[in-house]
């Protein structure tokens, strides 16, 4: 698995950020979604972003956020990328990208083969694609649910943008996930937690060690 880049998402404390960065994370994800146990207020997120060392990309995750909400986040928090994790259309992705001049990662939920065309559609507007497990109907959260999808659905496929694999990844299944999908980037949140929203430094270190 040499060279797999890792995003640790849903960090809530400065020590979380330091644990991720010191273990070799390429990205740290900050969640702005009040329904999530990983949600951050702006002042808290600003502190976390400032704690990230140079070379670690700071990503803000939002869900169907308004321009007003995004304006406030971008103004308060030093960021390297925006992650849109709701039902945003390719047109909305393009709007956000143009408005802020930041790279945009668009999440696409996958449950079956019928979801795959969205990956190409969103690739036409986004800079990167996050391929995640589609949440069950009625789920409160669009991601971070600890669910995976059938990795065979994307085995051997290629897209026009860099992409990242997410959904139920853990230190135990990471090697198989990468082998089946060919992912060169992965995203983990609940898989390195001791409780919802509570990151475990030992699990973070173990996951990043497994990704090397």
Curated annotation (Swiss-Prot):
It catalyses: N-(5-phospho-beta-D-ribosyl)anthranilate = 1-(2-carboxyphenylamino)-1-deoxy-D-ribulose 5-phosphate. Coiled coil: none annotated. One of its GO terms (biological process) is L-tryptophan biosynthetic process. Keywords: Amino-acid biosynthesis, Aromatic amino acid biosynthesis, Isomerase, Tryptophan biosynthesis. Its EC number is 5.3.1.24. Pathway: Amino-acid biosynthesis; L-tryptophan biosynthesis; L-tryptophan from chorismate: step 3/5. It is an enzyme of class 5 (isomerase). Pfam families: PRAI (PF00697). Gene3D superfamilies: Aldolase class I. GO terms for molecular function: phosphoribosylanthranilate isomerase activity. It comes from the Bacteria. Belongs to the TrpF family. PANTHER family: N-(5'-PHOSPHORIBOSYL)ANTHRANILATE ISOMERASE. This is N-(5'-phosphoribosyl)anthranilate isomerase. The lineage of its organism: Bacteria, Pseudomonadati, Pseudomonadota, Alphaproteobacteria, Rhodobacterales. The gene is trpF.
């Amino acid at each position: 698995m040499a060279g797999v880049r890792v995003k640790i998402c849903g960090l809530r404390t400065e020590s979380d950020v330091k644990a991720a960065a010191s273990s070799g994370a390429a990205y740290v994800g900050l969640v702005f979604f009040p329904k999530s146990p990983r949600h951050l207020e702006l002042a808290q997120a600003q502190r976390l972003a400032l704690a990230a060392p140079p070379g670690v990309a700071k990503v803000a995750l939002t869900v169907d956020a308004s321009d007003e909400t995004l304006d406030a986040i971008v103004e308060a928090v030093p960021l390297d990328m925006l992650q849109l994790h709701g039902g945003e259309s390719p047109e909305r992705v393009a709007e956000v990208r143009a408005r802020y001049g930041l790279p945009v990662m668009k999440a696409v939920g996958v449950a079956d083969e019928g979801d795959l065309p969205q990956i190409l559609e969103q690739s036409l507007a986004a800079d990167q694609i996050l391929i995640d497990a589609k949440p069950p109907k009625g789920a409160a959260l669009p991601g971070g649910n600890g669910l995976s999808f059938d990795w065979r659905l994307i085995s051997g496929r290629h897209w026009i943008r860099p992409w990242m694999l997410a959904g139920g990844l853990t230190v135990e299944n990471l090697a198989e996930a990468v082998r089946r999908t060919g992912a060169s980037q992965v995203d983990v949140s609940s898989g390195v937690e001791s409780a919802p929203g509570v990151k475990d430094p030992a699990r973070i270190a173990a996951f990043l060690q497994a990704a090397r």
